[in-house]
Amino acid sequence: MSVAVVGQGEVLAGIGRGRDVRVSAYVLRRGEAVVRALEGAARRGARVSVRLEGQPYADARGEMARGNRAVAKELRAFGASVTLAGARAEPVHMKAVLVDGIAYLDDRNFPSGGRDTIVATRDVRDVALVKAALDGNSGADGHLATEKAEALEFEATAIRDGPGDRVDVESEGFGFSPVSKALRERALGGAHVRLLVAAQELRHPGTEERRALAQLLDAGVTVRVGTTNEKLCVAGDRGWVGSANATFPEPILDWGMVVRSASVVDALRTAFERNWDEARPVALA
């Protein structure tokens, strides 16, 4: 298995030299580096295909949907093939770039700001899984899952089985799930558990997010809220990273990967500590 945490520059370079470039994202924004790289690849004759979500969740004003339509129009003008998942299509939440046998998986939507975690894998099983997912068929190979429900089970297992007495988790969205259950079990068992979630998830009182967080606070979990919106976990000598939010385990295309490489786990730990330091204690009252 060959998995490493990489910067966005490596993804852009891969797109820049690739002959066959396939992309899945929830949203992309005009002018961002990855969009410009895709335009350049299509312009020079590479085969570029992109799949975006056509009806993003919690998009009451339609801004994300309009943004995706604008990106689709722009990419098509350069010769790329773009699909917008509609009401009858399986939702697109997987963030992936597949270029000539290398899969780049992001826990966010390849933002230009760099506040994301990207893993690159050349493992033939991983690459085959990502390719199948981009074709609409989810699966798992023991450490990588391309369906949300399975990805969250992988994360929950890492939380339960991680050695030591510290568990750190970040998720943009949060609710009752295998992850919340595993966190509660570890906290009640005496582990020091920290959880970081997106502040925007707590805008409305009486939500599932608030109820799930209240239960964890009662169990002794330390909770903060922030704006980094990453999705990762560190538990002892193992970690997990993905684009799957720790919410209801739906059978949708997404991704999550368990990692044991010391360098990758260290990178996840560094990302968590940076995000944690910038966050603030949760206030549910």
What is each model feature region?
Residues 1-19, 24-163, 178-182, 189-264, ...:
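HKD-type phospholipase D/PLD-like phosphodiesterase module
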Residues 169-174:
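Long, repeat-rich segments with strong aromatic
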Residues 271-285:
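Charge-patterned, long linear interaction tracts outside catalytic cores
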